[in-house]
């Protein structure tokens, strides 16, 4: 029962207690404070690299990815907000549409290392749980031919310029002043959501 109340509190639901992050729709505030986490704004791949694999990657993502702002908040979440569409046709797509009077949040992610610390802020204690600045880069890799195999963020001479050559957009962030350590997400398709890659603590 306590676990369920806590989970409802984290996402802003009515947890049946006097403590709520959304007392009323007009006073709902699920985004905590941003302190040292300088936002990163990322759109289409734009690096002019003379690499066949990268050119395929840039072409396949051209005018597809919305402009996304990444920042973390001290309640332990990394947030992804859609700030602009790169394709006018996206205005007909509910997932890609940017609303001027809404948060336009695509998703929020809690690194595994932060999860055990979140109960310390319940019901209303300010903590520095995630305070680093995200860095986003396009990273070369190779896709093994086996079905269901994971992408390796590394390359060798054999894979360059072949069908195994692949690129991903990867976000790496430290935990900042909250704790030592780093985590990484694959944010190649921000609308579909992030893929957790690793964490170092």
Describe the role of every protein-language-model region.
Residues 1-201:
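A fold-level detector for beta-propeller and closely related beta-sheet-rich head/sensor domains
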């Amino acid at each position: 029962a306590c676990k369920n109340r806590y989970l409802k509190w984290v996402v802003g639901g009515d947890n049946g207690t006097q403590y709520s992050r959304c007392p009323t729709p007009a006073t709902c505030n699920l985004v905590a404070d941003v302190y040292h986490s300088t936002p990163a704004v990322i759109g289409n791949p734009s690096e002019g690299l003379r690499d066949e694999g990268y050119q395929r990657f840039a072409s396949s993502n051209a005018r597809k990815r919305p402009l996304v702002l990444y920042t973390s908040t001290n309640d332990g979440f990394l947030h992804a907000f859609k700030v602009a569409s790169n394709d006018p046709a996206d205005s007909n797509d509910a997932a890609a549409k940017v609303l001027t009077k809404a948060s336009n949040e695509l998703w929020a992610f809690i690194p595994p290392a932060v999860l055990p610390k979140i109960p310390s802020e319940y019901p209303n204690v300010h903590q520095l749980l995630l305070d680093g600045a995200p860095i986003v880069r396009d990273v070369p890799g190779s896709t093994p031919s086996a079905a269901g195999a994971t992408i390796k963020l590394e390359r060798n001479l054999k894979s360059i310029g072949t069908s195994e050559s692949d690129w991903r957009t990867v976000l790496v962030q430290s935990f900042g002043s909250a704790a030592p350590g780093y985590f990484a997400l694959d944010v190649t398709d921000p609308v579909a959501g992030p893929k957790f890659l690793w964490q170092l603590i």
